[in-house]
């Protein structure tokens, strides 16, 4: 005679996402001890998650609040809009903030519902049956403007930006966050661009100009012009503003009395 009920099987399936026969076997093996059955299935689930480790997690969402931005990945957009998945992302943001975590390692070790964030993510992964991954985390301590962008109305945000700033104009800071979301700058200012990258851009510009047959006496001016083009594409403060293309982002921020001190941009599935 079975020492468990159909309700136990149903509850175990709902909690772990395991199949009916797996749940029955787990309850039989543990003589109806529900907690041990859950543990056994979670161990099995964890192994299954490991087998799924090479799958791509190109879907998911970004979530942000109180100076914390996270990217939580899934394999499909179906899971990305799952209520439990969205709730987990928001809980992770709160856990990271509470723990004062500064990097992914710290975020995964942060406490959440009596476990670590990493354990909770893995448990939901086992339940849903897809690889889930907390991919990256960014945090700022100062005043922060946040912008989240949805690719479509039925999906959670896929692009998230935090802009840390000083000054009183939240509107100007949010405009900068929208700029970062739209034009994807890699650096805040020219000083942040690594010297080797500047040297490479300068060399490429010079070699290209020579290959185009430009006169030697004009090379320096041409190279500087092309290097400025690189800065306009990649440096936030040098970019033409999406709000007023006749002005740079820096010019608009200066007018508003705002100084951007840092930013982070996450886009689901992108580097």
Swiss-Prot record:
GO MF terms, alphabetically ordered: translation elongation factor activity
Annotated segments matching region Involved in Mg(2+) ion dislocation from EF-Tu: 76-79
Keyword hit for Cytoplasm: yes
Location(s), subcellular: Cytoplasm
InterPro entries referenced in this protein's UniProt entry, alphabetically: EF-Ts_dimer_sf, Transl_elong_EFTs/EF1B, Transl_elong_EFTs/EF1B_dimer, Transl_elong_Ts_CS, UBA-like_sf
UniProt entry keywords in alphabetical sequence: Cytoplasm, Elongation factor, Protein biosynthesis
Keyword hit for RNA-binding: no
Annotated GO CC locations: cytoplasm
A Pfam family that the UniProt record links to this protein: EF_TS
Job of this protein: Associates with the EF-Tu.GDP complex and induces the exchange of GDP to GTP. It remains bound to the aminoacyl-tRNA.EF-Tu.GTP complex up to the GTP hydrolysis stage on the ribosome.
HAMAP family listed in its UniProt record: EF_Ts (MF_00050)
Family as reported in the entry's similarity comment: Belongs to the EF-Ts family.
Protein name in the entry: Elongation factor Ts
């Amino acid at each position: 005679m079975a020492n468990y009920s159909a309700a136990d099987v149903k509850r175990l399936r709902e909690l772990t996402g395991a199949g009916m026969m797996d749940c029955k076997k787990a309850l039989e093996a543990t003589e109806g001890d529900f907690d041990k059955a859950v543990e056994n299935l979670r161990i099995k689930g964890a192994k299954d998650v490991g087998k799924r480790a090479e799958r791509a997690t190109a879907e998911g969402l970004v979530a942000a609040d109180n100076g914390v931005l996270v990217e939580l990945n899934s394999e499909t957009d179906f899971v990305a809009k799952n209520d439990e998945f969205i709730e987990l992302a928001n809980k992770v943001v709160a856990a990271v903030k509470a723990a004062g975590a500064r990097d992914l390692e710290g975020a995964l070790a942060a406490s959440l519902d009596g476990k670590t964030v990493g354990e909770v993510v893995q448990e939901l992964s086992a339940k849903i049956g897809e690889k889930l991954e907390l991919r990256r985390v960014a945090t700022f301590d100062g005043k922060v403007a946040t912008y989240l962008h949805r690719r479509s109305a039925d999906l959670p945000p896929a692009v998230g930006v935090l802009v840390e700033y000083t000054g009183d104009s939240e509107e100007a800071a949010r405009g900068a966050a929208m700029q970062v979301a739209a034009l994807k700058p890699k650096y805040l200012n020219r000083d942040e661009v690594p010297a080797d990258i500047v040297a490479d851009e300068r060399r490429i510009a010079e070699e290209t100009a020579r290959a185009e047959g430009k006169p030697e006496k004009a090379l320096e001016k041409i190279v500087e012009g092309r290097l400025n083009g690189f800065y306009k594409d990649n440096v936030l403060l040098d970019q033409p503003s999406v709000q007023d293309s006749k002005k740079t982002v820096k010019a608009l921020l200066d007018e508003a009395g705002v100084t951007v001190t840092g930013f982070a941009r996450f886009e689901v599935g992108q580097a």
